[in-house]
């Protein structure tokens, strides 16, 4: 069989073997793993492998087979396997068999696994046998020894591996037995290995790792002797062992013990002096410097933990910290952030502890720490500040942590903080240095200063903040910054973006200045200079377009300087030129917009707002400026519209260009409307009317284009606040064009319903709009039903299903808008009354559909509206609906509603298996049903109660329960009946 195993493994690993032969080989291999004969054959091959080498693939397979069978073995078999493994290892050592590392590790894992089964009762001499094997001090023996000991740690001591309670108990017994029988000998053997620096690098690193692993649960006194620690410390000066030595020392210093013992340990180890003896200044091994920083951090954290647990040791701990701080500062100030951030945990813990123990934070120490933090927040000399790479992102994260430290110091020592931050801001921004890194630090700290004032980190009485000296200092800095030539003299993206961000963020500070208007104009001039909106750097340019919009929107400057506004509008003309680009798809097939159009819209909105802010006395100028913006767009649209149908079809860029122009018109109107106190003159409305007409002409010429329909809807929604009732001359045509589109998408109709809901709300008192809605309601509802039906090939596509749910919700929200805006009469006019029954039926259908609970709940909400407005006689109950009195009652609606509402209210919770009131979504539906019943009771009175009584009796409800339900329905208010109904349903379903 051994020969067969050889052949099977060889075939299975072959890249050229026949597939059928390979399948047979795999089948045979699986059989070997699962049979006792196969296991024994593999053990035989393993035992011979010391004298008769086998290839790596076969050996790894044998290790796997043995590993998978250990758990199945009897005590006798375990003893035998343990003996055979030791014989094999002895043979490897005698014959200097040096397998690849992965095989040595796998073999060591076998020893570790069988150790767990034999050490307690079957073979307690396990370690003694290992000691015999390493007595020769051969490197191969020491290598296997250290690997086996490490593997045993992973089996029984690794605290990062989750284990069952049973395994944990077993491991505890194993550790107890080791402590009792072999701990001294083990620790001694490790010390002897460390005393020989000529041992191989792998052996020494493994041995250092072992000390770090086992010290966690062994007697620390065995390790903490001068000779033993000297053996470990020596490797801090050995290039190949120093990193592992740091990790070992971290584990030693981290061992849990009483506070006084831990303080004694820190003193004995004297790690600070050891580190001071190492020359790190010219060390180019960054990993080692990082590990030293980790070690320094751990010593500091351990001292702070001791102080938290035993405050009486303050003097001794403070003395140790005094020795440690120079190393902390050195690591914090290291040129590489990867080193600096390793002492962050200590700094954070220290500052938090200072809040509890103020005596810990001396003024001198915190002053030094704050200065180090500030210096560290500056960009490195080799950073260009332009590239958005991983290093920049990492620096931002580190900066954020440093800022938190700075904020904590501000809380601890407000005067120190204010003094330090004002010095750094003043020197960085106004010291004459044109180094962008220093200036950027000043901007960053100016922003931090304002945040500390806003969050009152310096603990001033709230009523005094705005009159405080720090607040006045900040305002002076801000004004000085705006009036300075700093941003002009230092041409760097970080400075430009930082400046614009600060002035936008702190616009409200400007309002407190007597020179507010001149400051705002100064900022607007900088925005419209080559440093802002026209910046050569695309990132700065696009960011400033948005910042410009935000600034204008937030400050709403009082502008009566027509020359200034005209200059802005004319100057911005080149930036307003729209050049559409077709979108592309990325590697994930997601659509990616090309060009800067979305950012351009901020400019259109800004200009709209600026023009609106001009005094009404300057109407001629306002009209002139609007023409300057609109005319190029009109010309563009005319070119698009005049293209032949074939060209429009073959060149999608034309429709994209038209879309962008329409969006620009709508966005300009939105900007003009930002000043909601504006009273729009007829001249302004005339201009927007022209724009609306152009939108309609464009839509007429692109009737099948979804992009154009979307842009037209967007624009009309923005024209409404300005045109008000004048919109109705365009609205009928617009709605007709949209609904007439034979390729209208579900998502489009969803958005269109939202637009119509806005129309219903804004024009609820307008007779012309009412008539328009009256004429479109039936075709609109038919269109909704057509697109939301579940028939067709696309009915099962997830995206389509989602879109249909959204359409149903939009439809019901639109119905709600009609009810709430006193227009329910629209449902029962001569034009629409035939469709009203379909509307109510659709609501019942949606209510029963629990596949999307939000749709069901919304449908029940609309049924409540139907009951409230049409229940009890079919006459509309809404005194504010001025058309209601002229319309006859809806015949038969009472009987229909009473029957269907009652059925729905009890069939939904009792007959739908998925209806579980423990689920929050179904509970909401249940609560909505209770409101539906309460609404009908209030509207239908005794007639409804009588019908309900008969229905519940037929349902099998006892008379007492029926009486209780009816009584509570009448006497409880809506809120309390909601609770009652949920309890009623829960109890009744629980009794079934």
From Swiss-Prot:
Single biological process term from Gene Ontology: tRNA processing
Compartments where located: Nucleus; Cytoplasm
Listed GO CC annotations: cytoplasm; nuclear matrix; nuclear pore
InterPro entries on file: ARM-like, ARM-type_fold, Exportin-1/Importin-b-like, Exportin-T_C, XPOT
One Gene Ontology term of the molecular function aspect: small GTPase binding
Key words, A-Z: Cytoplasm, Nucleus, RNA-binding, Transport, tRNA processing, tRNA-binding
Gene3D superfamilies, per database record: Leucine-rich Repeat Variant
Domain of life from the UniProt record: Eukaryota
Role, per record: tRNA nucleus export receptor which facilitates tRNA translocation across the nuclear pore complex. Involved in pre-tRNA splicing, probably by affecting the interaction of pre-tRNA with splicing endonuclease.
Family of this protein: Belongs to the exportin family.
Protein name: Exportin-T
């Amino acid at each position: 069989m051994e020969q067969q195993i050889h052949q099977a493994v060889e075939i299975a690993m072959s890249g050229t073997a026949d597939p059928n032969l390979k399948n047979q080989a795999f089948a045979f291999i699986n059989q070997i793993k699962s049979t006792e004969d196969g296991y024994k054959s593999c053990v035989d091959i393993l035992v011979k492998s010391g004298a008769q080498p086998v290839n790596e693939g076969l050996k790894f397979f044998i290790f796997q087979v043995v590993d998978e069978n250990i758990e199945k073995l009897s005590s006798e078999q375990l003893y035998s396997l343990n003996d055979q493994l030791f014989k094999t290892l002895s043979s490897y050592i005698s014959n200097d068999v040096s397998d690849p590392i992965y095989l040595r590790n796998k073999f060591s894992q076998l020893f570790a696994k069988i150790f767990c089964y034999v050490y307690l009762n079957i073979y307690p001499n396990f370690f003694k046998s290992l000691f015999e094997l390493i007595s020769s001090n051969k490197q191969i023996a020491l290598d296997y020894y250290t690997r086996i000991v490490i593997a045993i740690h992973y089996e029984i001591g690794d605290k990062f591996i989750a284990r069952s309670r049973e395994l944990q108990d077993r491991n505890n017994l194993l550790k107890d037995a080791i402590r009792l029988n072999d701990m001294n000998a083990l620790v001694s053997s490790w010390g002897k290995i460390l005393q020989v620096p000529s041992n191989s690098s792998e052996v020494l690193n493994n041995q250092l790792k072992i000390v770090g692993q086992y010290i966690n649960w062994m007697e620390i006194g065995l390790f903490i002797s001068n000779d033993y620690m000297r053996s470990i410390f020596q490797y801090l000066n050995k290039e190949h062992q120093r990193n592992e030595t740091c990790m070992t020392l971290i584990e030693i210093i981290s061992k849990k013990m009483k506070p006084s013992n831990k303080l004694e340990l820190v003193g004995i180890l004297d790690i600070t002096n050891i580190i001071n003896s190492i020359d790190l200044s010219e060390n180019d091994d960054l990993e080692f410097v990082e590990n030293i920083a980790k070690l320094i951090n751990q010593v500091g954290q351990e001292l702070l933990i001791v102080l938290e647990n035993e405050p009486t040791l303050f003097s001794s701990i403070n003395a140790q910290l005094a020795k440690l701080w120079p190393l902390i500062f050195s690591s914090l100030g290291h040129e590489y952030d990867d080193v600096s951030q390793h002492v962050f945990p200590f700094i954070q813990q220290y500052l938090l502890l200072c809040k509890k123990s103020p005596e810990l934070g001396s003024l001198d120490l915190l002053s030094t720490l704050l200065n180090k933090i500030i210096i560290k927040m500056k960009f490195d000399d080799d950073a260009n500040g332009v590239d958005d790479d991983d290093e920049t992102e990492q620096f931002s994260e580190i900066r954020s942590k440093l800022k938190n430290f700075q904020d904590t110091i501000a809380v601890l020592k407000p005067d120190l903080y204010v003094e330090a931050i004002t010095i750094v801001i003043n020197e960085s921004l106004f010291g004459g240095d044109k180094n962008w890194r220093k200036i950027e630090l000043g901007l960053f700290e100016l922003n931090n200063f304002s945040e500390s004032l806003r969050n009152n980190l310096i603990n001033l009485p709230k009523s005094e903040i705005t009159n405080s000296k720090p607040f006045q200092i900040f305002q002076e800095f801000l004004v000085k910054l705006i009036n300075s030539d700093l941003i002009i003299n230092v041409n760097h993206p970080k400075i430009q973006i930082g400046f614009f961000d600060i002035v936008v963020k702190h616009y409200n500070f400007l309002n407190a200045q007597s020179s507010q208007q001149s400051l705002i104009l100064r900022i607007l001039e900088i925005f419209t200079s080559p440093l802002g909106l026209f910046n050569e750097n695309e990132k700065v340019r696009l960011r400033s377009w948005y910042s410009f919009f935000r600034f204008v929107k937030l400050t709403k400057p009082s502008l009566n300087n027509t020359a200034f506004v005209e200059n802005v509008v004319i100057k911005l003309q080149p930036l307003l030129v729209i050049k559409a680009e077709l979108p592309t798809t990325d590697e994930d097939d997601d659509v990616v917009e090309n060009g800067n159009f979305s950012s351009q819209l901020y400019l259109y909105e800004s200009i709209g707002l600026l023009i609106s802010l001009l005094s009404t006395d300057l109407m001629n100028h306002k009209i002139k400026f609007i023409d300057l913006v609109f005319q190029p767009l009109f010309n563009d649209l005319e070119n698009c519209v005049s293209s032949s149908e074939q060209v429009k079809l073959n060149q999608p860029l034309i429709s994209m260009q038209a879309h962008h122009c329409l969006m620009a018109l709508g966005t300009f109107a939105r900007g003009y409307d930002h000043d909601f106190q504006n009273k729009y003159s007829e001249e302004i409305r005339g201009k927007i009317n022209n724009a609306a007409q152009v939108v309609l002409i464009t839509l007429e010429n692109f009737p099948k284009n979804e992009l154009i329909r979307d842009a037209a809807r967007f624009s009309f929604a923005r024209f409404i606040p300005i045109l008000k009732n004048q919109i109705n001359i365009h609205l009928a045509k617009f709605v007709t064009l949209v609904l007439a589109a034979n390729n209208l998408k579900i998502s489009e109709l969803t958005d269109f319903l939202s637009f119509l809901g806005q129309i219903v709300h804004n024009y609820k008192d307008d007779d012309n709009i009412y008539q328009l809605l009256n004429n479109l309601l039936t075709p609109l509802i038919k269109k909704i039903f057509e697109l939301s039906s579940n028939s067709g090939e696309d009915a099962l596509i997830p995206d389509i299903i989602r879109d249909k749910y959204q359409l149903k919700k939009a439809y019901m929200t639109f119905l709600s808008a009609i009810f709430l805006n006193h227009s329910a009469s629209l449902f029962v006019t001569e034009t629409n009354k035939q469709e009203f029954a379909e509307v109510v039926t659709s609501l019942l259908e949606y209510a029963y559909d629990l596949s999307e609970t939000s749709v069901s709940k919304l449908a029940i909400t609309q049924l409540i509206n139907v009951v409230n407005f049409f229940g009890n006689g079919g006459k509309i109950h809404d005194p504010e609906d001025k058309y209601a009195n002229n319309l006859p009652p809806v015949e038969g609606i009472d009987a229909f509603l009473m029957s269907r509402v009652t059925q729905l209210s009890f069939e939904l919770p009792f007959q739908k298996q998925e209806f579980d009131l423990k689920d929050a979504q179904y509970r909401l539906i249940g609560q909505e049903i209770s409101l539906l019943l309460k609404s009908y009771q209030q509207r239908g009175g005794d007639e409804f109660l009588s019908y309900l009584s008969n229905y519940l009796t037929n349902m099998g409800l006892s008379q007492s329960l029926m009486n209780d339900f009816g009584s509570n329905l009448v006497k409880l208010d809506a809120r309390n009946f909601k609770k009652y109904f949920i309890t009623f349903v829960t109890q009744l379903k629980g009794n079934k």
